[in-house]
Amino acid sequence: MKLSTITTICLSISGAFGTTAIALPTTVALLKNHQQQNTEKQQNPIKDIRFGLNNVQVPNTIPLHQTVVEVTNNKAIVDYKDAPQKFFLAKSALNNKLQVEFDKFLLRTGVINALNADLKEWIDQTLFIPNQSFFDLSANKLNLTLSNQSEVSLDLEFIFTNFSDKNQPLKLPFDGSVVVNANESYTYSVKATLQKLKVLTYSRADHSVGISYAIPTVSLNGKTQNDFSFNPFKSNINFAFKNVYNALNPFEAQQYLVGQGKFLNQKVNADDVKNDINNHIETQFNVAKITATLLGKAFKQFGEHKNGQPLSLLKVLSGLNNEFKQLFNYVRPGLGDFVSDLIQSSSQSSNKKTVYQLLFENKTTIIHLLQDLNISELNSVLPVVDILFEGINSAESLYQRIQSFKDLIVPALKADKQLKSLEAIILAVLDNPNTYVFDLVYQNKSILFNLLSDFLKNTANTLPFLQEQFDIVNHLFANEAIFDLFSNADFVEKIADLFLAKQKVQEVNNDGTKSTKIVDSILVATLKGLVGDQLSSITELLNIYIFENEFLNRNDSNSSVKKQQTDSLKNLFSVIGDILSETNVNKITLHAVKNNELLSLVETASTLKIKHLNVQYKVLVDKFELKNSFIKELLNFFPDTKDITPTIKKVLFESENYKTLRKKYENEGFPGYHWAKFIVPGTFNSAENTFYSAIDKTKSIRDLFADMLFGKSLESVNDSDSFIKINGSFTLKYHGDNLNLLPNYHSLITKNVGYQIVNVNFHIDARLLTAELQNTVFSNPKPVIKSPVELSKSLFEVWKTIFENSVNQILKKEYTFKDNLKFFPFKADGSSRLEFDLSKPDQRVIPFAFVDGYQFQLKKELIPNKETKKEANSSPVLKLYDAVKRNDRQYRPNHHHDDLRNYPSLKSQLELILNLGDKLKANNDFIDDTVVNALQYKTSFKSTLKVNSLGIPINLFFFTLWLKFNLEIPIDGSLTLTSVNVVFPYSLYDTSSNEFTRIVDRLNFTDTNFYLKDAFPNFWFVGF
């Protein structure tokens, strides 16, 4: 939405209710009557001086039309080398440009009438109103001249007449006063020679910069006054900047807010910090538990709803609204009530909430949320939204209030290109007081789909290093079906349609025409994106059982499969509900270990620090269970086709590795038996036939997985038995020395502010946590692949090895990384943590200001080349991790791992990732308060499928010779999660993309790599 459109509507609302805090546009029809009345009053003043009414006539006191300038990076006002086209700016960014722009404005605009209007207000507010009880006011001279639109002279002479019968004090500007005898007069003069008007700034309602002016030197009754202004707090010239704020950027503000005797040091004490840290840990834990049980209840409802009426998502959410309220009140005080009402804003809900009820009952929360979006157009409007609710006491009266402005809103919608796409939705809300949010979402899914697609496209352009992840997200939102989840249809059926069925996607051809393309289901597309090209050795296996599996990639026309999918999903949801049941989740508990130590804050002239921090909690896990039923329900998504012989043939005996091995032995003979090359072909043929004969052709791939995972037949697996039990404990610790405390800004400009602890060590010790398989013995007397091959048993042993390695290499370890511990502006009880006084210039902060020299760009090598094929270990994140670690080793050979603040390599690490702006690079304090983490979690597994003394019959003319061979198939692979992240204390502009700019305080680079080495079977003769 354009600012001009919003401002016209909202400032008109302001005018209608008599608010004068904002200069009003004179073109709005709503104000014409009001202005006419004022003009008539000025032309026909009442003459009875006994009522003390002003009879000073100032001609043509008419404000100018509003002129609002949006500052962009286009050489007109500012021209920054590495900057986005659009940005927020603090006033200091334009300090040396304001006078120039003001002079240009004066030269092109006739402002004399507006100056007269300012003079009229000054006479009223400064001379007349303070003295009206005893004095009449008239003017002998009233000469205000403007030369060349930029120079002004004054010759004003006022006469105050004391109409009382007593001597009275006459109040004069700048706290002066004189006593005037009864029925006598006093002359007051204001004089200034021709001088150039000097620019003067003031804060508008949204704290953006409004322009007033001052006269450099004025004589007030003979006393010289410098920089004199008729109205320093607003001006009828109505000149302002849209995205420039009369506030400090965070780098400027820090010197005024942090340090001995300053705001943060006065407001934050040691007890606050200790309590906030403890509450933070406990809140995060509670949020995790409530989220888990909430999901468990929802999954259970979907899973157990087998027959009858469709069970929609919104019906389930509506039934859980109390749980949602509790959860979101933890996330942000007051948010729970809004979310609870929001999920009931549907015609499907038993306790329906209309859009107007939602707005009326959650006004404050909604405004806070909109502030957090930091959209400049919205922020310019929010300060006057309160006017809309003035005198409103019900949702119905809110609807009537908005109806009174419909004639203003509708033309604005049609005139604004961006708003026009939302016209149908907005008109639906305007026309009907009984509209519901989720009904609007479903009914207007085409509109919202287009907006969402554009948003994802724009966001992807700002995050080039996450292109693969965005490809997956784009696939999810490739058509409007995502919005069907909010309909009254059965939710599980819609999940099957959306995630497990092939999708129809519209594409735009080169000639501009559209065509429909059938693409993989979202699940299969996601799995392909995650797997990539790194599992070539099992490509056939993946194709058969995953990518081409009708249960996971259904053709939309196959309704019989859809029924099976839906039933399987419901069964799966039911067992997930059991895993996340309150009984199971409550086996995980949080206990304070060290949380009551006395904290000490130390301060200097420019800092506030925690001298020593050591807060520890322990999480106890008492036999948290993952049941066999969960694994069994997952296996139901594999095809139940009997006889896996074709699969074994493709995976083992038609693989390139096997063919290479066979060809080698056919040419060279078996080692030590080169003279007997003639038996090699028959040996291999017999080996293959022996494998085939060992396969139970009445069993499916599900049964083979049961052999591997349970060690028993699928039919004998008890659903209620445990598959994995997690037991033990892990500790959480926040610690560090001399930790900086800084403000934490959460929205554009607001009095509510939090604080942050910078560069805190966060330590997780999970060495006492165990995860144990409960099926540890292979006991299936009739496996899928039986003797003499016994491949089922070998697969079972391989699975155990992989699981145990993963637990030891990933779970039972210690992890330490850095973070900024941020506390939001509101406490758990909803009260403000810290409050700025926005009337004080050093407490108005615009945290998202672009500051030239503090921007950055991603290094080009972090952006994958889409034209080249991604190979194992070649992702930019892995290269970045290696570079950061090499940098660590180069600079940090003799330092303890946790002591990061004293390392000289922090700037070097940042420069491996980013091209830093010159001021950012030079600000060592900011660099020291920046976090760089390079973390890698890796589990490797190496095992061997073994078949010993495999008897192979070799037919030799008149008799059969039985030879014995050993077969080994090595399995060697790894799973690696690599993460490099950067955390800034304040938000910076990422200008890596010319078209789309992000404002960020955190960068995350992640890479998941699953690698399976090509298996080369080893097959050798061991005797007769």
Curated annotation (Swiss-Prot):
Instruction: Indicate what this protein is called per its UniProt record.
Output: Uncharacterized protein MG075
| Natural source organism | Mycoplasma genitalium (strain ATCC 33530 / DSM 19775 / NCTC 10195 / G37) (Mycoplasmoides genitalium)
Entry annotated with the keyword Acetylation: no
Please indicate if the UniProt record lists Transmembrane helix as a keyword: yes
One Pfam family cited in the UniProt record for this chain: P116
Q: Which UniProt keywords apply?
A: Cell membrane, Membrane, Transmembrane, Transmembrane helix
Q: Which superkingdom does the taxonomy of this entry point to?
A: Bacteria
How would you describe this protein's topology in the membrane? Multi-pass membrane protein
> Which residue windows are transmembrane per the record?
11-31, 951-971
**GO CC aspect terms:** plasma membrane
Tell me the InterPro entries matching this sequence.
MG075-like (IPR054689), P116 (IPR057145)
| Location(s), subcellular | Cell membrane
